[in-house]
Amino acid sequence: MLLQRQFEMPESFFVLSKDYLELATDEITALAKMHDRFSKIKIISNLVIVQSKTNWNEISKRATFVKISGQILRKMSGLFLDEENVGVLKNAKTFVCRIINLSSNQINIPELENSMGDMISKFSHAKVNLENPDITVYLIFTNNENFFGFSKRTKKMARTKKIKKFPHELDWKLTRVMINLIGLEKGETVCDPFCGTGTTLLEAESMGIHGIGLDFDEKMCKIAKANLKTNGYNSEI
């Protein structure tokens, strides 16, 4: 039964920035396992494939170094599309095709994207929209496998703002990764004993995690409070 359950679980893909790639892949793994301990992970360079019951966007919206993400529909042995492949466009009014080449082969990306768009148009009533499509269709090339996938339009998360900064404060990306590697879930609490300008608290609150901050410097506590207030967060300082 377990094998059948895993076989039927959908696959998601995450194309990561190559900055801190090892941390980035560990973060995706931690987030996937946090939501579903039966998740299976496959890493191909800066592409991470996750087989899990968890929706790709639940992982992507918390991850730090994800450039592109979505759901895999199938592996591709060739560039052949049929009605089954484009069924995801059934209720979409607009779409765009995007090629992600992670292989060592030279590919004429604009030409291939146009060809894909033409093929999809034969099976779907959706129109091409390059700026703000309902669905983005992806063809991902690697040296060993090709994948056909998609993502639906999602609302972009606003970055937290700081009205006051400090030269030696924590980098927000590394801070967010650390929180995610710990595996804290929404509604849980993180405590930062040296909160400084509030970077850890801001990142935690942006993911629905409560924060408690301490600092021996009263000036830093005031700065952290001001930064939290600007974003409407209520971490305890």
Regions found by a protein language model. Give the residues of each.
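An N-terminal amphipathic alpha-helical segment
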Residues: 75-91
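Phosphate-coordination loops involved in phosphoryl transfer and adenosine-cofactor binding
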Residues: 91-94, 187
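Basic, glycine-rich polyanion-binding accessory segments appended to enzymes
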Residues: 94-100
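Class I S-adenosyl-L-methionine-dependent methyltransferase catalytic core
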Residues: 2-61, 65-68, 72-75, 103-118, ...
